[in-house]
From Swiss-Prot:
Organism whose genome encodes this protein: Arabidopsis thaliana
Name of this protein: LanC-like protein GCL2
Family the UniProt entry places it in: Belongs to the LanC-like protein family.
Coiled coil as UniProt keyword: no
Any one of the GO CC terms: extrinsic component of membrane
GO biological process: carbohydrate metabolic process; peptide modification
Amino acid sequence: MAGRFFDNVMPDFVKEKESVSGGDTLRNLLAMPYSSLSQQLKRSALDLKETVVIETWGFSGQTVEDFTLYSGTLGAAFLLFRAYQVTGNANDLSLCLEIVKACDTASASSGDVTFLCGRAGVCGLGAVAAKLSGEEDLLNYYLGQFRLIRLSSDLPNELLYGRVGYLWACLFINKYIGKETLSSDTIREVAQEIIKEGRSMAKKGSSPLMFEWYGKRYWGAAHGLAGIMHVLMDVQLKPDEAEDVKGTLKYMIKNRFPSGNYPASEEDKKKDILVHWCHGAPGIALTLGKAAEVFGEREFLEASAAAAEVVWNRGLLKRVGICHGISGNAYVFLALYRATGRSEYLYRAKAFASFLLDRGPKLLSKGEMHGGDSPYSLFEGVAGMAYLFLDMVDPSEARFPGYEL
């Protein structure tokens, strides 16, 4: 597969028509009324959901090798959870809990503590699903297990394996179960440790906060500044801490590439290559949009919109997934649509989703699009595409899984 992305030859805007037929099938999807397209996406999502469950749960004999939400079986449970939210089908919630139970057993001895790649994801999703299904004993069990998670002193701070990945799980639980289910003192303690380490590492540079993961100072959502700032903005910060978060994001804006894209790390400031959620403009655009909401400063919204232009032009990736694929990049436009109400952003999300709906299966089967090392997983594979399609049913409720609350 030469090149990282498909040339985006889709029109900047296509007016919707009540009746479309013949000609280019992708163009027809772009012209289809949103209400009709969203139902088509929903049907495709539910079909994909069944395939994902069969491939990750049925064919495995209901055994779990990789329990994580990112690349493993818990991702299927999270997709079922989202399907339940969209359709109200209680069978999806029941199966979600069944899969979480198996993941609970498989992860019992895991030292990983985050939502996406660790024990907190299992216990967090288990608690929320149990709450929604009215199973009080099971809810208390998962909350009890969550409270047993301990953060080591040498834990990194990033989203996939570090402190903010644990913190996000706390916030997820409190959103669905109740504000003080996990105490604000617990959350503050973790946030303060993150800020303390960020300030310590930043002493030699221009950014108020800086973090390191395996020897590199990453900027992106998965391992770096964008992901850490994003989660911290959902926590009650002291004024000086909030200023440091704001200043860190302004440092990133000031040091972006002329193209509007962002370096993957401090060490990669000359490499304008990646346009992924994990590294580059997409994940950072989501964080800047969040900053506009939290701080009320137009600079952040303008920077998010500029990053979205990069995603539109270079983000039609030759990968399907949420982490580094088209599915994840579509969330940039959904977030900006929520923030601005501008139809052009909904159209762009619709365009990326329509491209996947129309051409994704064929491109995957021909090897012209990469399905990821775990092809049915949430963050690398087609489960992420199904999740996006479900989120397209009601764009006002769309949230990047494991990142936006």
